[in-house]
Structures are given as C-alpha cells and as structure tokens.
C-alpha cells in the first residue's frame, strides 16, 4: 500500500502569498494525497487528529509555525502507535521550524522531499494548561522577551517576511525594557 499524505493547508498563512503554488501542487498531486484546508483557529488540530485516526501515514502542515503547532497538538493527542509522521510545507512568514530542520523554503522542493525524504525524530515539548488541556510544540517555547516580540508582530502585519521579525525585535529592545 502506498503511503497516504494528508496535507493540512492554512490559506491565511503569510496572508495567502503561497496560494498559487499550493494550487499547482494540489493539482499535480497523486490521488493518495488528501488536501484539507483550515477554516478557523485550532481547526488544524482537529484535522490532524482525524487524519491520524483515518490511517494517514504522513500528516503535512502546510503553513507557518502556528499551523505546525496546531498539527503537532493534534498528532500528539492520538496514541503513539497510531501517530503518523509529520511533514512540512513552509508557507508561513518566518518559517523558523522549517529553517531549523533544513527544509527548503521553495515549496516545490519541499513537496518533492515529502515524497522522497526519510523521517527523523524531533523533540516535542508539552505543557498542561490550568484547564487540563495539553498543548505541544516542536519549535521553541518562550514566556519573556520572545513572547513580546511575537505579540508585537501581530501589530506590524504590513511588514512582510523575515524583516517583520527583525523590526519587531528591534522595537521590543527599544521600547520594552526596564533599566535596572
């Protein structure tokens, strides 16, 4: 049996800048690649969990770091023996996890690697929230300076790509500090 890939695509990642490439990849993909589009926050978590339970061998997060977070949370909610491999098509603004993992930012190359590459383990972090829910991450976790930078990026959406994070970092250094 050929592997089945369930590709969870967030059309709002990077403000939809990758929509044309995603359409082309989708049109050329084999029938065992199931494309699922998210429609709301946390939808990727549900889709990933359902894909795992449906027997997908690979669940692909096609989005940014937020989409990866949601997909990982969905995959970690199923038993280890049911858990498929995680794949990535980097469609976000920063694509930090893709960069750290050596995944090409060219979507055609990344898609080709999904079909020819080999799986490798990644570390997953877990936190249990006060309401009892578990959240997972595969990239980084932060509660201080880095969290302020990410919060600032939400107000600077008119800046595109990697410069968004550089400018948000510089503004956070300049305005969110305490002299001791």
PLM features: what roles do these ranges have?
Residues 1-59, 69, 73, 108-109:
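ATP/NTP phosphate-donor binding region
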Residues 6, 38, 76-180:
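Catalytic core of DAGKc-family lipid kinases
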Residues 61-62, 88:
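Short beta-strand scaffold positions
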Residues 65:
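Polar, low-complexity loop segments and adjacent catalytic/binding residues used for recognizing
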């Amino acid at each position: 049996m050929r592997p089945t890939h369930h590709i969870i695509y967030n059309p709002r990642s990077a403000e939809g800048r990758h929509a044309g490439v995603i359409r082309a990849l989708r049109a050329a993909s084999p029938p065992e690649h199931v494309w699922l589009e998210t429609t709301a926050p946390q939808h990727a978590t549900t889709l990933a969990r359902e894909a795992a339970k449906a027997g997908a061998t690979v669940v692909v997060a096609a989005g940014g770091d937020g989409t990866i977070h949601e997909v990982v949370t969905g995959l970690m909610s199923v038993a280890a023996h049911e858990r498929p491999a995680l794949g990535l098509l980097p469609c976000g603004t920063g694509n930090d996890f893709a960069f750290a993992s050596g995944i090409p930012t060219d979507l055609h190359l990344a898609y080709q690697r999904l079909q020819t590459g080999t799986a490798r383990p990644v570390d997953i972090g877990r936190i249990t929230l006060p309401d009892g829910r578990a959240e997972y991450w595969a990239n980084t976790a932060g509660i201080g300076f880095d969290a302020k930078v990410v919060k600032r990026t939400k107000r600077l959406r008119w800046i595109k790509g990697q410069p968004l994070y550089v400018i948000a970092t510089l503004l956070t250094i300049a305005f969110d500090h305490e002299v001791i």
